[in-house]
C-alpha cells in the first residue's frame, strides 16, 4: 500500500483558526477519499506556517468494477426510458431486463476502468483544499487563488515521487522549510517519516498536541520551581500553541514598582497584549512573576528574557501612568463627559443611558441610596484613560476608582459587577449589582428593540439574546420577586414612545428567550403550560409540574383532562351549568367537587403552593371517571347535552387555573 504526503506552506496562520482547520481538513479528506472508494488512514497536522496531510493504506491502482443500475420498468413511458439511457450514455438495446415482484425492469451494467492512484489524486486534493472555507481569506499578488494567508509552497509526494499537482500558480515539489528564525532552509523530503524527522532536526514540532503538551509541562515545572500556582487558561494555551513551532517556556519577573497597579490591570496587560501567563502564591495572591513561551531554541536566552521583561515593563509603565492620572479625578467629575459618548445613534449618549438606568433603579428600590449612587457612576470609568486603553477592564476600574475616592464597598462592587453575567459560564452578580445589572441590561434591550435592532436569524450585533438571558438568570438565580411586566412598561416609558406597541414586542422577545433558557431542563409542552414573566414562579411551577406528571396520579390526571378536553373540542361553550337539568347523580357529583375545589384552588395558588393545588385537582379523577362511565354527553335532548358540555367546560377551567393543561 502507498503513502501520500501533502504540505500547504504559508505565511502565519492565525492561531485561533488552526484547530478548526485541522479538524475540518481531516473530515474533508476522509470524506472525499471515501467518495472515491479510497479507504485510507488520514492524519492532519497544523502549525503556524503549515497544514500537513498524511494518508496511508492507499492502493496504487483502483481496480475495475461492475455496477448494476436499475432503470424504469419496461412498461414505463418511452420518454422515461430514453431519459435513463441519456443519463448513463447507453443505447436502449444495450439494456438488460430483470423480473422484480412480477414486473420487468430495465438494467444497465456500468463498468469502470482500472485507475492509477497518482492520476486521480491531483483532482481529489485540489477539490479537498477548496472545500474548506476560512472565516476570512485573501487574494495576494496578481494570483487568482485565495487562502487564509499567502501560500508560498506546496509539497506533495506519493510513494516517494513528486505528484504533478498544480494549485493556482504553485506547482507541487518535494521541498519544505525549517524554523523561520533558526533554521529557515530548504529541506528535501522523501516520505512522511523523513519529513517529520527533518522538521524536528530543524526546530519544528509537527504535532499540535505535542507542542501543547510541551507548553503545559514547561509552565507547570517553572511554576513549581518557584512554589507558585499557575491559573489554568486553556484558551491562552491554545493560542500560544498556534504561535510557536518549537515552544520553549521561560520565567520572567515583574518589577516591584508596578505592583501598586490593580492585579486585573497587570493580568490584562500580560494575557491580552503579551500572551503571558500569570502566577499566584499558595494563598491565591498575585505573584510578581510571569511565564511566557518563545518560538525556538536560542543561544542567548538571557537576552530574550531581558527583552520580554523590558517590553512588559514598558506596557505596565503606560498602565501605571494612566492609573495615576485617572485617580486624580472622581467618578462624579467624569459624569458630564458621558454626554459626548454615543450609546447608539438613535438612542442618544451614554449620559442619557445612565439617567435611564438610574430611573429604573429608583423605580425598583426607591430607598436604596447605594444602588442609586452606583447607577449614576456605573459608566464613568468608560471615559477614563485606563479603560480607553484596556476596554476589558470596564467596571473593574470603576470599582478601584470608587474605592480610592472613599465610596463604600457596596457602591464599588455594584459598579464592578453590573456587567455580569457575561456569557453562560459567568456567575450572576449579587448585592446591589443584581439590580444595577438588571437595569442596565433592560434599558439596552428595550431601547434597541424600540429602534428596530431586534435580532434576525443568526445575526445579533448588539448581543440582545445574551442580554435577555442575563436578565432571566439574574431574576431566577437571585429569586427576585418583581412584577417584570410593570418593570418593562416603565423602562419603555422612559423612551417617550407609544408604550403599548413596543411593550408587546419586548414581552414577546423575553418570552422566547425564557423558553430557550428553560428548554434544556424541561419539555417544551411543560414550559408552554406554565410560562409567564414571573420567572421565579415559572421555575417553581416547572419543577413542581415535572415531578407531579411522572407520578401515576399525575399521568391519570392528565389523561382525564385530555378526555374532557377532547369531548369539548373546538366548540364554543357558553352559558352557566343548570343543576335542574341534571338527570344523573354522576353529573351532580362532578359539579359539587368542582364547586368545592374551585374556591380552594384560588387561595392555594395565591400562596403559590402548586403541589397542593395539583394534588387537589386529583380529587376530580373519580367523579370524571364515573361521569364518562355512566353518562352520555350527547343526549337526545339538546338542552341536557349542552348543559353537560358546560359542565365539562367548567371542569377544564378548574384545571387551567393551576396550569394550562390544554398545552400539555
From Swiss-Prot:
InterPro entries, per the entry: DALR_anticod-bd, Gly-tRNA-synth_bsu, Gly-tRNA-synth_heterodimer
One protein family per Pfam: tRNA_synt_2f
Keywords recorded for this protein, A-Z: Aminoacyl-tRNA synthetase, ATP-binding, Cytoplasm, Ligase, Nucleotide-binding, Protein biosynthesis
UniProt GO BP: arginyl-tRNA aminoacylation; glycyl-tRNA aminoacylation
PROSITE patterns attached to this UniProt entry: AA_TRNA_LIGASE_II_GLYAB
The keyword Coiled coil is annotated on this UniProt entry: no
Enzyme class: ligase
EC number per UniProt: 6.1.1.14
Protein name: Glycine--tRNA ligase beta subunit
Amino acid at each position: 500500500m502507498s503513502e501520500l504526503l501533502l504540505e500547504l506552506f504559508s505565511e502565519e496562520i492565525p492561531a485561533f483558526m488552526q484547530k478548526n482547520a485541522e479538524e475540518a481538513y481531516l473530515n474533508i479528506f476522509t470524506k472525499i477519499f471515501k467518495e472515491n472508494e479510497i479507504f485510507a488512514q488520514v492524519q492532519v497536522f497544523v502549525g503556524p506556517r503549515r497544514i500537513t496531510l498524511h494518508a496511508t493504506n492507499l492502493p496504487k491502482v483502483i481496480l475495475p468494477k461492475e455496477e448494476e443500475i436499475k432503470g424504469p420498468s419496461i412498461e414505463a413511458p418511452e420518454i422515461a426510458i430514453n431519459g435513463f439511457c441519456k443519463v448513463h450514455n447507453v443505447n436502449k438495446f444495450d439494456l438488460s431486463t430483470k423480473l422484480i415482484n412480477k414486473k420487468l425492469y430495465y438494467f444497465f451494467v456500468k463498468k469502470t476502468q482500472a485507475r492509477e492512484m497518482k492520476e486521480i489524486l491531483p483532482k481529489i486534493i485540489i477539490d479537498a483544499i477548496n472545500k474548506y472555507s476560512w472565516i476570512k481569506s485573501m487574494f495576494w499578488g496578481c494570483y487568482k487563488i485565495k487562502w487564509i494567508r499567502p501560500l508560498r509552497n506546496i509539497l506533495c509526494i506519493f510513494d516517494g515521487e513528486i505528484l504533478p499537482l498544480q494549485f493556482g500558480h504553485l506547482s507541487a515539489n518535494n521541498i519544505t522549510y525549517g524554523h523561520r528564525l533558526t533554521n529557515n532552509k530548504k529541506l528535501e523530503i522523501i516520505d512522511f517519516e523523513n519529513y517529520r524527522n527533518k522538521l524536528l532536526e530543524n526546530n519544528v514540532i509537527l504535532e499540535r498536541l505535542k507542542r501543547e503538551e510541551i507548553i503545559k509541562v514547561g509552565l507547570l515545572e517553572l511554576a513549581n520551581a518557584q512554589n507558585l500556582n499557575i491559573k489554568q487558561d486553556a484558551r491562552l494555551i491554545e493560542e500560544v500553541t498556534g504561535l510557536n513551532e518549537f515552544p520553549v517556556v521561560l520565567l520572567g519577573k515583574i518589577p516591584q514598582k508596578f505592583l501598586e497597579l490593580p492585579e486585573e490591570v497587570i493580568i490584562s496587560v500580560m494575557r491580552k497584549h503579551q500572551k503571558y501567563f500569570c502566577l499566584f502564591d499558595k494563598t491565591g495572591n498575585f505573584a510578581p512573576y510571569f511565564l511566557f513561551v518563545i518560538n525556538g531554541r536560542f543561544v542567548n536566552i538571557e537576552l530574550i528574557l531581558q527583552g520580554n521583561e523590558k517590553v512588559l515593563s514598558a506596557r505596565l509603565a503606560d498602565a501605571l501612568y494612566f492609573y495615576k492620572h485617572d485617580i486624580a479625578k472622581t467618578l462624579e467629575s467624569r459624569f458630564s463627559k458621558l454626554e459626548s459618548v454615543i450609546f447608539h445613534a438613535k438612542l442618544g449618549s451614554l449620559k442619557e443611558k445612565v439617567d435611564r438606568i438610574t430611573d429604573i433603579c429608583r423605580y425598583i428600590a426607591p430607598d436604596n441610596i447605594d444602588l442609586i449612587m452606583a447607577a449614576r457612576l456605573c459608566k464613568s470609568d468608560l471615559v477614563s484613560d485606563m479603560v480607553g486603553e484596556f476596554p476589558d477592564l470596564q467596571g473593574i476600574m470603576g470599582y478601584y476608582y470608587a474605592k480610592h475616592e472613599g465610596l463604600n464597598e457596596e457602591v464599588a462592587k455594584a459598579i464592578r459587577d453590573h456587567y455580569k453575567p457575561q456569557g453562560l459560564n459567568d456567575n450572576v452578580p449579587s448585592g446591589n449589582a443584581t439590580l444595577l445589572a438588571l437595569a442596565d441590561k433592560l434599558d439596552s434591550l428595550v431601547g434597541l428593540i424600540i429602534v428596530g435592532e431586534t435580532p434576525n436569524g443568526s445575526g445579533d450585533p448588539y448581543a440582545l439574546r445574551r442580554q435577555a438571558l442575563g436578565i432571566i438568570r439574574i431574576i431566577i438565580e437571585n429569586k427576585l420577586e418583581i412584577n417584570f411586566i410593570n418593570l418593562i412598561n416603565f423602562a419603555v416609558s422612559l423612551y417617550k414612545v407609544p408604550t403599548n406597541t413596543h411593550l408587546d414586542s419586548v414581552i414577546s422577545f423575553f418570552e422566547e428567550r425564557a423558553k430557550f433558557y428553560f428548554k434544556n431542563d424541561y419539555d417544551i409542552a411543560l414550559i408552554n403550560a406554565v410560562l409567564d414573566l414571573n420567572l421565579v414562579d415559572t421555575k417553581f411551577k416547572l419543577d413542581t409540574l415535572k415531578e407531579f406528571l411522572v407520578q401515576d396520579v399525575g399521568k391519570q390526571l392528565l389523561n382525564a383532562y385530555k378526555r374532557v378536553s377532547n369531548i369539548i373540542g373546538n366548540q364554543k361553550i357558553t352559558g352557566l351549568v343548570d343543576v335542574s337539568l341534571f338527570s344523573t347523580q354522576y353529573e351532580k357529583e362532578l359539579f359539587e367537587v368542582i364547586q368545592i375545589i374551585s374556591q380552594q384552588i384560588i387561595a392555594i395558588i395565591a400562596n403559590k403552593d402548586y403541589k397542593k393545588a395539583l394534588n387537589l385537582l386529583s380529587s376530580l379523577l373519580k367523579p370524571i371517571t364515573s361521569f364518562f362511565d355512566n353518562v352520555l354527553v350527547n343526549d337526545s335532548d339538546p338542552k341536557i347535552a349542552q348543559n353537560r358540555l358546560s359542565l365539562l367546560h367548567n371542569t377544564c377551567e378548574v384545571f387551567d387555573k393551576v396550569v394550562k393543561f390544554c398545552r400539555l
